[in-house]
Amino acid sequence: MSAARQPSPTVRDKAAPEPAAPAAPKGARAPRARRAAPPHGVRPAPALAAEERARLLEGRHHDPHAVLGARTQRGGVAFRVLRPYAKAVTVVAKGLRTELVDEGDGLFSGLLPLTGVPDYRLLVTYDSDEIEVHDPYRFLPALGELDLHLIGEGRHEELWTALGSQPMEHQGVAGTRFTVWAPNALGVRVTGDFSYWDAVAYPMRSLGASGVWELFLPGVAEGALYKYEITRPDGGRTLRADPMARYAEVPPANASIVTASRYEWQDAEWMARRGALAPHQAPMSVYELHLASWRPGLSYRQLAEQLPAYVKELGFTHVELMPVAEHPFGGSWGYQVTGFYAPTSRMGTPDDFRFLVDALHRAGIGVIVDWVPAHFPRDDWALAEFDGRPLYEHQDPRRAAHPDWGTLEFDYGRKEVRNFLVANAVYWCQEFHVDGLRADAVASMLYLDYSRDEGDWSPNAHGGREDLDAVALLQEMNATVYRRFPGVVTIAEESTAWDGVTRPTDSGGLGFGLKWNMGWMHDTLRYVSKEPVHRKYHHHDMTFGMVYAFSENFVLPISHDEVVHGKRSLVSKMPGDWWQQRATHRAYLGFMWAHPGKQLLFMGQEFAQGSEWSETYGPDWWVLDSSYPAAGDHLGVRSLVRDLNRTYTASPALWERDSVPEGFAWVEADAADDNVFAFLRFARDGSPLLCVSNFSPVVRHGYRIGVPQEVGQWREVLNTDLEPYGGSGVHHARALRPEPVPAQGRAVSLRMTLPPMATVWLRP
């Protein structure tokens, strides 16, 4: 029932509800301390003690509801209102209209001869305006005891529903509940455009030992800008964005925005079937991109018109989005997050981002987002020393400071911080239907001595260098995500030999579904960057990955990190002239797509962009324009990537047994002088696929490749040297039949012509 339709107020002996957000006029001066003569027939309420009055006005009061609002006492009902800049405040109820006494400093009070607290509103008069509002200090807490209990335990898996700003109806009145965790604060006030950014009027109440502060503001609706003014333990004040904000201003502005989702998802079919296969037993080829620079200037909704069609045409099964959580500095590419619960507003609203994810799902494309639990920046309006003391960061400065990036590391041992991060992972999966989370910089979390000199770190309780708190966090996050969201995959960017990254948590592992194989990437790129004549001395770089290929469930990443900061683009790493560079680029991708592990390729590399990636300008799309003389060269590489993905997806041998030794067998691993590699992949039913790579610039005629005796013929299903891809066209037009000539330890072999700098796939 709305306030306007409520029956006549009954007498109460407790404060009731009904608030509304006042607004001080622009340009108003700070209120003067004055005590006006009381209106006719109105007695002032009993005066506040000097210390309590000071705490209220200075933002140090832990329970403003105890002194503001209305309550019964001897002689009637005492009203007290804090309205800076107001000329007068009048209590309005059915049969009642009484102006309160001006106590000075924006305080107004009155003791009215009533037997109970009525359902009242406040008529607030300013120099040039008069508004009628509900009193925020008549309301009971809008956060339940169960929420507080779960927050206190560090087990609130849907933390974003309890903390932050929540538009809602409370006690029959529409408004917004503001809640923030700030256990060290002497006081917290909420301010925003609804108060002309004056915080004095809206002190929040402390909800006991939880460390949570709460205030329900009637009349504050979606779209309102806000921040919290926190009084630190030293008495100073700091103005902060909401750590739980689900929407924020476009940087460099940094206020939080009240929001609620009304998006109606259209991806039910996708969500129902995405968990049919375990990710490591399903095809997965990932197109990594930076949303803001893929097509610079596009909004989320404009991206939804172009990105799904492009990715689907190329045959990728997933996209991986570099961090979309809000971040102040675009040059960080999103890896220095300040708004962990807010998709960046640079490209639109949270619902606009939902629209993009939905469009990708409807195109049959999974969505992985980069998630950054390792650190956060030091901006003084964000998380750093949020309530005046280390809160989200570790109390030990040596543990808090990230030595590589000048940022701060989370205190993984604090239950509320752990809850903040675990719930954040749940949030992206639940609220945005993402299909995977790639945890960034996991290695920096796992080791106490990561990038630290001796004396700059202290060992764990067992004397070791492992960060046991970080281990516990990652295990809890993975266990929670996999329990709640079947079909979602978590991926670790972990660059060390930590044992059990993708082992289940109940077996002592970290519990990730997949791990980036950084070692494979570095080794193989080192090989292909050498001149062909020198590659024989580095042959092991291409084979060593198989020594540990099944120790974890791997992703083979050619990511953004490999095409920036002087590392050159993928094609530019290759030696030789332009033809040789493209040929080696294509051969490498063919080798990579057939190798055990999932594939990841960063944007621009699918068409052999020659320059490094720029977050400002994005991929060099112009090289695909027909007016560019070499456009055909780049289009040829893109056509190859399309056919790699399509053939890969149609070949269960390449993904059904990706993480078990039975799915792979070397055929030729020792032909260092020839720069040749050959291996077999096997599907669950035993059907094979043969991959042969020749990384030398010469055609090798009559080359013997041993094959299984039971297969009667082999046909070429992919060849990176075909002319449409920009190759020389050396291929096998007809099926090849094994001959009874032993090779590589097998009784029969194929007599092949190996194209130069190329990879060939054959199937029965």
Swiss-Prot record:
CDD domains hit by this protein: AmyAc_Glg_BE (cd11322), E_set_GBE_prok_N (cd02855)
GO MF annotations, alphabetized: 1,4-alpha-glucan branching enzyme activity; cation binding; hydrolase activity, hydrolyzing O-glycosyl compounds
Pathway this chain belongs to: Glycan biosynthesis; glycogen biosynthesis
Catalysis performed (reactions): Transfers a segment of a (1->4)-alpha-D-glucan chain to a primary hydroxy group in a similar glucan chain
Main enzyme class: transferase
Keywords: Carbohydrate metabolism, Glycogen biosynthesis, Glycogen metabolism, Glycosyltransferase, Transferase
Catalytic center residues: 440, 493
EC number from the UniProt entry: 2.4.1.18
Gene Ontology cellular component list: cytosol
Domain of life according to the entry: Bacteria
GO biological process, one term: glycogen biosynthetic process
PANTHER family: 1,4-ALPHA-GLUCAN-BRANCHING ENZYME
Subunit relationships: Monomer.
Family the entry assigns: Belongs to the glycosyl hydrolase 13 family. GlgB subfamily.
Protein's name according to its UniProt entry: 1,4-alpha-glucan branching enzyme GlgB
Organism: Kitasatospora aureofaciens
